[in-house]
Amino acid sequence: MADRLTQLQDAVNSLADQFCNAIGVLQQCGPPASFSNIQTAINKDQPANPTEEYAQLFAALIARTAKDIDVLIDSLPSEESTAALQAASLYKLEEENHEAATCLEDVVYRGDMLLEKIQSALADIAQSQLKTRSVTHSHSLPDS
């Protein structure tokens, strides 16, 4: 996973791409402008362009990307954050990490204990089945 600055740069690049695409679609689909002193030939056979749908699509994309950029900017450390605050935050994160590691070790230990019990039970079942088979096999043999 990329760091926050890389994510922010990617989001800004995505926003720039969306603006370029929106402008390109507007140029392609927009009706020609009329100039009073210049006569232009307008192709009357052009099909109706779904410019409203494009406008809504690009507006939604641009708005969502702008919100993503705001969230990424808000997640960056502020200038007000001093070294002492950062150290305290790191210390707290380390404590939480140690607590999680202890909890994980406990869960692994309990899992190992359960595994031993299950393996012991499976061994007992296998022994019982072997004994049962040997007893039934010896009873089924005809006497000579």
Swiss-Prot record:
It comes from Mus musculus (Mouse). GO terms for biological process: blastocyst development; positive regulation of transcription by RNA polymerase II; positive regulation of transcription elongation by RNA polymerase II; positive regulation of transcription initiation by RNA polymerase II; protein ubiquitination; RNA polymerase II preinitiation complex assembly; somatic stem cell population maintenance; transcription by RNA polymerase II. Keywords: Activator, Nucleus, Transcription, Transcription regulation. Component of the Mediator complex, a coactivator involved in the regulated transcription of nearly all RNA polymerase II-dependent genes. Mediator functions as a bridge to convey information from gene-specific regulatory proteins to the basal RNA polymerase II transcription machinery. Mediator is recruited to promoters by direct interactions with regulatory proteins and serves as a scaffold for the assembly of a functional preinitiation complex with RNA polymerase II and the general transcription factors. Component of the Mediator complex, which is composed of MED1, MED4, MED6, MED7, MED8, MED9, MED10, MED11, MED12, MED13, MED13L, MED14, MED15, MED16, MED17, MED18, MED19, MED20, MED21, MED22, MED23, MED24, MED25, MED26, MED27, MED29, MED30, MED31, CCNC, CDK8 and CDC2L6/CDK11. The MED12, MED13, CCNC and CDK8 subunits form a distinct module termed the CDK8 module. Mediator containing the CDK8 module is less active than Mediator lacking this module in supporting transcriptional activation. Coiled coil: none annotated. The keyword Secreted does not apply. This is Mediator of RNA polymerase II transcription subunit 21. PANTHER family: MEDIATOR OF RNA POLYMERASE II TRANSCRIPTION SUBUNIT 21, RNA POLYMERASE II HOLOENZYME COMPONENT SRB7. Belongs to the Mediator complex subunit 21 family. One of its GO terms (cellular component) is core mediator complex. GO terms for molecular function: transcription coactivator activity; ubiquitin protein ligase activity. The gene is Med21. Pfam families: Med21. SUPFAM superfamilies: Mediator hinge subcomplex-like (SSF140718). Expressed in brain, heart, kidney, liver, lung, skeletal muscles, spleen and testis. It is found in: Nucleus.
